[in-house]
Each structure stands twice: as structure tokens, then as C-alpha cells.
Curated annotation (Swiss-Prot):
Catalytic reactions of this protein: 7 malonyl-CoA + acetyl-CoA + 10 AH2 + 5 S-adenosyl-L-methionine + 2 H(+) = dehydroprobetaenone I + 10 A + 5 S-adenosyl-L-homocysteine + 7 CO2 + 8 CoA + 6 H2O
Quaternary structure (record): Monomer.
GO molecular function: nucleotide binding; oxidoreductase activity, acting on NAD(P)H
Keywords per UniProt: NADP, Nucleotide-binding, Oxidoreductase
Protein name (record): Trans-enoyl reductase bet3
Protein EC: 1.-.-.-
Pathway named in the protein's UniProt entry: Mycotoxin biosynthesis
Keyword Nucleotide-binding found: yes
Function: Trans-enoyl reductase; part of the gene cluster that mediates the biosynthesis of betaenones, phytotoxic polyketides involved in leaf spot disease in sugar beets. The first step of the pathway is the synthesis of dehydroprobetaenone I by the polyketide synthase bet1 and the enoyl reductase bet3 via condensation of one acetyl-CoA starter unit with 7 malonyl-CoA units and 5 methylations. The C-terminal reductase (R) domain of bet1 catalyzes the reductive release of the polyketide chain.
Pfam families: ADH_N (PF08240)
Length: 364
């Protein structure tokens, strides 16, 4: 049962008792988040996965005293009346706590709340930290990039693959989102072409990429086009989103144009092709909440259609998870529970982690 005297959580605070590069502190006696709908459940958190958004949001959109953390694995201990899942089930998923109207919910806590329609049931063969690495931020972002009509608008799914076998460029193929996107695209009938380092190429190919191009190569664009085997590339997912990645993606798309989905705001100066439709994908749009960050690109209104997309993809991925097919980046477990989370986020922010997913056990 949830504690009656509040819970422990990592919150945003500029009054940290010890020096830290991030405005985060471990707080006790925090209120438990309420269930915002009859579809939501309360989960006792067992382990968490860390994402770049967890340090970027508290750095650029600081919200005093808000709880933090997205990806988690845990056990359902309370259910809403319309929950799709029962009590006692071990699940993984995510919340997006970085919004002003959501001060108490977040994965970096003893208890988190999530929409049951977006959770995955964890098979016994998958450990807590493996499940936390799967979470939902990566696959949820990839799902919206693929299926949002204003993003890549790709209709294929694992249960109904697209028979056209279209090539899809994934820049940053070895990132957490890139890795799951390659798998989702491959299972949905598409031909993923990954841009990554030479060291990450074997991993991307093993997950379903038809081939890789090295982002440091002077022939990167030519190599990408060669991997398309004569087909025009009309879809690109940019999991890095900087001037270099944007340039490569746009140059790789067909002369007649295409679609470019990215994960960060892009300078207008970088968008050099009017024939390319651009969408900055925010994974939190799948949660169907208003998110007002005071920024024209990152603020979004609740979107029921994208909430349905996320729910559809949870249903699509469950059989793959049951079969042991879904893979993540190699894991690096950081000790220390909540203090370990802050340490790990500082490692991630400092650029010390490449090609690994940081995970932390929370259960004592």
C-alpha cells in the first residue's frame, strides 16, 4: 500500500544542500500524485531509465518543486475504474512530468501514475532494469514520428506491414529512440537506413537496418542514397537534430520532397527545402495533456488522436515484448537509488555516456 506519510521523490530545486550541476534534490514526504482519469493506475516504482530530456527539461524549463523522471518499471498497486490492466501486474511505461500542471507525478519517485492504455506488461524473463530501459519515451516518440499524419505519416504497423517496403532514414540510429525506431520500422514493413558511428553499425544492422552510413564521412549523403538501392527516400527521422544532422537528412530526401521528423526545434536557416514537410515530434503529445512551456515549438495542446496512436502502438508492441524481440541500448546500471539517479543524470548531461542506457534500481 502507498505510504500515508508521503513518498520520496527527486524534485526540481535551486536550493540543493550539496553542490550539483543540476537543480535537483531528493525530497521526502511528498504528496502522492492523484489518478487524473479512470484509465490511470498508480505504480510502485521498481527501476527507472534515464533520458536526455530529464536533464534538458530541468535546465531549460525549470519548475520549482516539480517531480522529475519519465521511464519506469513497477507494479500496479491502484487502478482506476476503467483501467485496462489489473492490480499486481509488473509494467513499464512513462510519464512526462515537466509541465506546470503536474507537480507531483514523475518516474523518479516511489510511486508514479500512468495511463494503463500506454503501459506494457513485462514478461518474467525481463528484469526490472531491462523493463525500465524500454519504458515508453523511446517507443512513444518513435510511434508518433511514424504514425502522426503531420510527421512521417507512415501507415504500416507490425500487425499490418506496409507492402511498399519504403526506405526510411533514421539519423542517430544508435540512440535510444533510434534503436527502437529501427525495430518498429522494420517490423512495419519499411527499410530502415541508419546514420551512426562505425562502432554502432553492427548493432543497428542486427536490429533491422539494411545498412548504415557514418555521420563523420564526407560521403554520408551519397552512402545513404546508395543504401536505398535506387528508391527515392521520402521519409527521415532525425534523433539527433543539430545543424549537421538536419543538413544530411534534407540532402538525402528525394528531389520532389518528403517528410522530416525531428526531436528538437530546428533553426529556420537549416530548413532549406520548401518541398519537405517538417514536424518537431514531442513524445508527450501522446499523453493528451496540455503542455505549456512558454515556447512556441515545445508547447502543445492536448491531442486525443495522438493519444490513440500511442495506445495503438502499445498494443502492437506487447506481442513483440512477449516474444523477447524488443531490444534496447546496452545497459549501464548506476547504484544509489535516488542519489544515483542524480549522479547518472549529471553523467548524461556531461556527455560521458555514449551508446548506453543508464538505469537505476529504486526498490530497496
Amino acid at each position: 500500500m502507498p505510504p500515508t506519510n508521503g513518498q520520496t521523490a527527486i524534485i526540481q530545486s535551486k536550493t540543493c544542500p550539496t553542490p550539483t550541476t543540476l537543480p535537483l534534490v531528493v525530497a521526502h514526504g511528498r504528496p502522492l500524485p492523484p489518478l487524473p482519469s479512470s484509465h490511470h493506475v498508480r505504480v510502485r516504482v521498481l527501476a527507472v531509465g534515464l533520458n536526455p530530456t530529464d536533464h534538458k527539461m530541468v535546465t531549460h524549463f525549470f519548475m520549482q518543486d516539480n517531480t522529475t523522471g519519465c521511464d519506469f518499471c513497477g507494479i500496479i498497486e491502484e487502478v482506476g475504474s476503467a483501467s485496462a490492466l489489473p492490480l499486481g501486474l509488473r509494467v513499464c511505461g512513462a510519464d512526462f512530468p515537466y509541465r506546470p500542471s503536474n507537480p507531483y507525478n514523475g518516474a523518479f519517485a516511489e510511486y508514479a501514475v500512468a495511463d494503463s492504455r500506454h503501459l506494457l506488461q513485462i514478461p518474467d524473463a525481463i528484469s526490472n532494469i531491462q523493463a525500465a530501459a524500454i519504458g515508453a519515451i523511446g517507443w512513444g516518440t518513435a510511434a508518433l514520428a511514424m504514425s502522426d499524419p503531420t510527421a512521417l505519416n507512415l501507415p504500416g504497423t507490425p500487425s499490418k506491414p506496409d507492402a511498399r517496403s519504403l526506405p526510411v532514414l533514421v539519423y542517430g540510429g544508435a540512440t535510444a529512440t533510434g534503436i527502437i525506431a529501427i525495430q518498429m520500422l522494420k517490423r512495419s514493413g519499411y527499410i530502415p537506413i541508419a546514420v551512426c558511428s562505425a562502432q554502432s553499425a553492427p548493432l543497428c544492422i542486427s536490429l533491422g537496418a539494411v545498412g548504415t552510413a557514418c555521420y563523420t564521412s564526407t560521403t554520408c549523403v551519397q552512402d545513404i542514397k546508395a543504401l536505398a538501392n535506387g528508391q527515392s527516400i521520402k521519409h527521415a527521422l532525425d534523433c539527433i537534430t543539430d545543424p549537421e544532422s538536419t543538413t544530411v537528412c534534407l540532402a538525402s530526401l528525394a528531389r520532389i520532397g518528403g517528410r522530416y521528423a525531428c526531436l528538437e526545434a530546428v533553426s529556420d536557416a537549416c530548413i532549406t527545402r520548401r518541398s519537405v514537410a517538417v514536424k518537431v515530434v514531442m513524445g508527450f503529445e501522446g499523453q493528451n495533456f496540455d503542455v505549456d512551456l512558454g515556447h512556441p515549438v515545445y508547447s502543445r495542446k492536448a491531442n486525443p488522436a495522438l493519444h490513440a496512436v500511442a495506445a495503438q502502438w502499445a498494443a502492437e508492441l506487447q506481442p513483440l515484448l512477449n516474444a523477447g524481440i524488443i531490444k534496447t541500448q546496452p545497459l549501464e546500471e548506476i547504484e544509489g537509488r535516488f542519489e544515483g539517479v542524480i549522479k547518472a543524470l549529471e553523467m548524461l548531461q556531461g556527455g560521458h555516456i555514449k551508446g548506453k542506457k543508464l538505469v537505476v534500481n529504486i526498490s530497496s
